[in-house]
Amino acid sequence: MGKIIGIDLGTTNSCVAIMEGNQVKVIENSEGTRTTPSIIAYMDDNEVLVGAPAKRQSVTNPRNTLFAVKRLIGRRFEEKEVQKDIGLMPYAIIKADNGDAWVEAHGEKLAPPQVSAEVLRKMKKTAEDYLGEPVTEAVITVPAYFNDSQRQATKDAGRIAGLEVKRIINEPTAAALAFGLDKAEKGDRKIAVYDLGGGTFDVSIIEIADVDGEMQFEVLSTNGDTFLGGEDFDQRIIDYIIGEFKKEQGVDLSKDVLALQRLKEAAEKAKIELSSSQQTEINLPYITADASGPKHLNLKITRAKLEALVEDLVERTIEPCRIAIKDAGVKVSDIDDVILVGGQTRMPKVQEKVKEFFGKDPRRDVNPDEAVAVGAAIQGQVLSGDRKDVLLLDVTPLSLGIETLGGVMTKMISKNTTIPTKHAQVYSTADDNQSAVTIKVFQGEREMAAGNKLLGEFNLEGIPPSPRGVPQIEVTFDIDANGILHVGAKDKATGKENKITIKANSGLTDAEIDQMIKDAEANAAEDHKLRELADSRNQGDALVHSTKKALTEYGDKLDAGEKEKIEAALKSLEDALKDTSADKAAIDAKVEELGQVSQKLGEKMYADMQAQQAGAAGAAGAAEGAAHAGGAQQAADDVVDAEFKEVKKD
């Protein structure tokens, strides 16, 4: 069996590594470098260039040289981030027939996984040249905040490149593996991995523990921004240069694709130089021409100017750090080490901001360009069975649940739950003699289901006719190690079952993930009010149902006046529940009123029960009715009412 290689498929650069025994080897490519630019050029003669050769010719072939394609992988064309990139990229971003964002080169439509596969193919060939044998299996890393769609697209890219992707793992987790196995420190440690790459930002809080000689890596929480990275820093420099040139020369370079490609190259170079110098000069002769002749660009940029241009981008990385610390249930002072990953973390301003937030200097002994590939190689060795002393426990980034009565999102699996995981909960019907239920599966952090992402729905049919609340329907959520969700529903009485797999292409887009979390925070108060209103309506519905049932059985034992009072209060509550504009206070008042006037009915029921000395089951049923009639809240043996619709049959 061949070796499982580890690949860091980056937005800007990619890297491949393997394990030789317990020693890691980051492999040099055919150009002699340990990282490869994630750039692909499609030439006139159908040749495809990858890496440094593609980068070298990009200025003369801007429309057919593709870079930062990882920002498009698994995305829909209509997303605002994609729309933003359309105006910035020299190559064409187009809408595919299925609504995804694709690219175009020489008039040919290309899917992002297809383009990324060229980079993976180069990584595969690099490993094969070193090993002298075919390579067919790989562990590929993705940003921790990548959604299922993006993960599946990355797996597809691997398959196109001729690789069986044994596992997709998160970049910060891979970096933690590389760090943890390289250090001699003993004892449990909590580390923060701050990963600012070319196109994405992630932060993960990870606990490294020594458990009976086995190194255990447990992700406590993760957060991030999947559209923030070095490309955005470059763009700030490009925009600044364009603005300055327009002021001086009166020419707008943003419409000139050849000039844009030269500016992109110069901006990246200037940014790198300013990490070690206080000032740099951008000198681009013959950048453009007009009626008066050729124009030359010459501009000095200081480190202070660059820091001013990108200050808000650096600041944007801090809020995810704050949320990750909170979600992990730790304090900043509990963090033993801060690991920097991604080339953009070489910027002094970034390091300064990280130190300011975490209160300690980040580690300098981790290579930010290679750590992720090294971690992927270690995981490959674990999966091949050659390494037994490492256990990796990762998490799911967003909560999963189903819609229940009143449109409430009832969470089955909370965000940052260790995967693989499985959870089951018993629900029931909302109407008498309901023969079918519809299970709606959602993902997100909002309290009301409508504010979250609908992943899918399915029916469970053939439920025997029963009063509402009697059938017991067990819903099971199961997330496997690859992050794929399986959902099942089973009628416990009949054993009838239905299952679906929520496939990756049903997952969230990264923009939706970011928006959900922002929405959840911004709308927390409104969500809470809606949740409380739904709870009041549910309580009112239950009281109406039980009071009607009690009146049918015991109403003739009441005085006419008492019965009329109950019926009037009952109608008043029903009217309030039908009124869509009724607020929580109005419904609660009607519930209280019906509870008060129903006390006599409850007393009659109780007296009748005592007199008859009914059997235990019958007594329990009557007591349940009395509790409802008296306005008490009923807890139905942990069975949650779920909002289900009748499935009509032809």
Swiss-Prot record:
Residues 612-650 are annotated as: Disordered. Transmembrane segments: none annotated. InterPro entries: ATPase_NBD, Chaperone_DnaK, Heat_shock_70_CS, HSP70_C_sf, HSP70_peptide-bd_sf, Hsp_70_fam. Keywords: ATP-binding, Chaperone, Nucleotide-binding, Phosphoprotein, Stress response. It comes from the Bacteria. The modification Phosphothreonine is found at T200. Residues 612-636 have a biased composition (Low complexity). GO terms for molecular function: ATP binding; ATP-dependent protein folding chaperone; unfolded protein binding. PROSITE patterns: HSP70_1 (PS00297), HSP70_2 (PS00329), HSP70_3 (PS01036). Induction: By stress conditions e.g. heat shock. Belongs to the heat shock protein 70 family. NCBIfam families: PRK00290.1, PRK05183.1, prok_dnaK. Acts as a chaperone. This is Chaperone protein DnaK. It comes from Burkholderia ambifaria (strain ATCC BAA-244 / DSM 16087 / CCUG 44356 / LMG 19182 / AMMD) (Burkholderia cepacia (strain AMMD)). The gene is dnaK.
